[in-house]
Amino acid sequence: MTISPPESGEKNKKVLEDPVKADPRPIDFAKLDKPGFWSSKLSKGPKTTTWIWNLHADAHDFDVHTGDAEEATRKIFSAHFGHLAVIFIWMSAAFFHGARFSNYSGWLADPTHVKPGAQQVWAIVGQEMLNADLGANYNGIQISSGIFHMWRAWGITNESELMALAIGAVVMAALMLHAGIFHYHKAAPKMEWFQDIESMLNHHIAGLVGLGSLAWAGHCIHIGAPTAALLDAIDAGSPLVINGKEIATIADMPMPHQLCDPQIIGQIFPGLASGTGNFFSLNWLAFSDFLTFKGGLNPVTGSLWMTDVSHHHLAFGVIAIIGGHMYRTNYGIGHSMKEILDSQQGDPILFPAPKGHQGLFEFMAESRHAQLSVNLAMLGSISILVSHHMYAMPPYPYIATDYMTVLGLFTHHMWIGGLFIVGAGAHAGIAMVRDYDPAKHIDNVLDRILKARDALISHLNWVCMWLGFHSFGLYIHNDTMRALGRPQDMFSDSAIQLQPIFAQWVQSIQASAVGTFLLAGTSEALPHKALSEVFNGSLVEVGGKVAIAPIPLGTADLMIHHIHAFQIHVTVLILLKGVLYARSSRLIPDKASLGFRFPCDGPGRGGTCQVSSWDHVFLALFWMYNCLSIVIFHFSWKMQSDVWGLTGGNFAQSSITINGWLRDFLWAQASQVLTSYGQSISMYGLMFLGAHFIWAFSLMFLFSGRGYWQELFESIVWAHNKLKVAPTIQPRALSITQGRAVGVTHFLVGGIATTWAFFHARLFGLG
């Protein structure tokens, strides 16, 4: 079993006096020639095929590489720079494709008719048919990342600017790689620096988030918003005039650096040319032309107003800079996280914990897995919130009418959120096994939760059963009634209604707030446009397509939402059980000594397999996948039916039966991917079949046991020996845990890629 290594380093010195250690570890390229160099066992090389799997399992498990927590933390810190380098290279590739292989200029000139493309297929074996006619004399593969819409919002108007960004991103990647090497080999931070929580919060909140948002606000104000104003005027057919010249095309537009000239910018936003005097005299109304609170969507682009976005980033940046300074660092004032936590007591009636939150600060500060768990849970939740905001409040010009991009980005952010939340459960389990010391948590809230785990899990189990039987039961009832020809006895908007009254109430109070509530600090009533149109608003149309419209809710939504609730609760049940029972259970009291992942509790103990914390993560991944599949199916059909007008509003009556989901969603909408051969979307037909194969391949790992394969290998090795071609590396069947890992990976990749092909072919096929 692996336990996180103990801390090292001096505790008494002030952190800022000596925060780094110089030349702690020389650069040694010889290690790169020896896979598994961190382990004496792995570094000897493979004797059996199990070696390669152990290499993969432990490559990033820094706890097993070193006996020093400081060293492990430095590796994590250094790896962050490597991660940033990969991100910059990825961004550079996107910019380069936009600069070299895309129709960005053509799309920018006519975004309602030209489709975005940034890749052209070479005619090697006849696959050039994948290059569709996307308009503007461009043939290529249509993309759905939303990157063109984002570039337009940034204020990028030509391919030269994209090439400059591509070069800049490569330079940044090189700097990040250098920083990763430098801060591990040349000037590595000490443990005290990593443990200086208040200083970290100060720099992350005020520095990274606050100053980052403020800097982006500066770009939006000086480049993004003026460029958007000029482009919007061109698209609306009423171009602006600058210095007596009509800006009728993109070629007529001023260069980005010219937009910083007060004489030019003053003709677009007079407030921007008014100087800083108004700022220091608090006459901020002078800036209300470029820092707005219009609300709603720009009718030309179907997206949020760029001046509203500028205002948002400015306000958020200021709030974060102020908020980042509320922690006690150098001057003895402000909050101490330890004092805050240690002073919090448990509720004396509902949750008696005599020692309250004592010990939690140390646990969170010292356990990297506990920190990662909380961060993953929060970031995953934020990703899911982002996915919902992107269609309700479209941030980028013309993105709302690019339906494939809207659906793709919703799906993308939902998957990210789900994977991160499962990751939160995984690292919480590792933290409990490796970092949790029961002696330091006697009678605090964490200890009390662990003592109440049986009540928590049994009640959560009851909730899952209740939700599952009732929500699924509604569908079974409806299928039965429809099969028997009794529509009057079904749960539907036209028979026995189950209206989502609470959700409808939330929608109505949003809408009723218009004109009645006053904006803070003013006598102005809340304007209608301050709300998303999905809350009983009005339809916004761009280029003859619906950008956003009110989203009505009815019986069908209540039914599927209770399926969502059921699946979310089961996923949480599995993850929470894996965390609360990570160290011990009635079945295996000494589970902590077995580690985070183990197949069974040794020979002679039947019925103790698949109980490790790792196995709970394994099971939760399946439930997360099932849960999010229904969520993205619901979103796809609901938007096509009730907002975009593509399926004749059939969601309310068809989705209330299981047969309706199979017939009118899966089967009917799969027609595009199944009939894609011979068209430019034929790759999605191939992907649909290939991804099904990958998914089916996973079942081989999930259904059959280790012994079956080992028995088969023995026979195959015997045949090789007979032919005198015996392998030097002895074949070994995958362990139980390895088989499950390979199985769930192929299950998820196959399922996600199948959905990807299904969604893309559907909406690309409809044009």
From Swiss-Prot:
Is this entry keyworded Acetylation? no
Question: Which GO-annotated molecular functions does the record name?
Answer: 4 iron, 4 sulfur cluster binding; chlorophyll binding; electron transfer activity; magnesium ion binding; oxidoreductase activity
Q: Which regions span the lipid bilayer?
A: 76-99, 162-185, 201-225, 309-327, 368-391, 407-433, 455-477, 558-576, 616-637, 681-703, 741-761
Cofactor binding: number and manner: PSI electron transfer chain: 5 divinyl chlorophyll a, 1 divinyl chlorophyll a', 2 phylloquinones and 3 4Fe-4S clusters. PSI core antenna: 90 divinyl chlorophyll a, 22 carotenoids, 3 phospholipids and 1 galactolipid. P700 is a divinyl chlorophyll a/divinyl chlorophyll a' dimer, A0 is one or more divinyl chlorophyll a, A1 is one or both phylloquinones and FX is a shared 4Fe-4S iron-sulfur center.
Q: What's the domain of life for this entry?
A: Bacteria
Which locations, inside or outside the cell, does it occupy?
Cellular thylakoid membrane
Question: Binding of phylloquinone: at which residues?
Answer: 709
Q: Where is this region: Disordered?
A: 1-22
Where does the record place Basic and acidic residues bias? 8-22
Q: Which SUPFAM superfamilies match?
A: Photosystem I subunits PsaA/PsaB (SSF81558)
Q: Where does [4Fe-4S] cluster bind?
A: 600, 609
Per UniProt, which keywords does this protein have? 4Fe-4S, Chlorophyll, Chromophore, Electron transport, Iron, Iron-sulfur, Magnesium, Membrane, Metal-binding, Oxidoreductase, Photosynthesis, Photosystem I, Thylakoid, Transmembrane, Transmembrane helix, Transport
Q: Which enzyme class? A: oxidoreductase
Residues at which divinyl chlorophyll a binds: 700, 708
The UniProt family comment states: Belongs to the PsaA/PsaB family.
Q: What is this protein called?
A: Photosystem I P700 chlorophyll a apoprotein A1
Q: Which taxonomic lineage does the organism of this UniProt entry have?
A: Bacteria, Bacillati, Cyanobacteriota, Cyanophyceae, Synechococcales
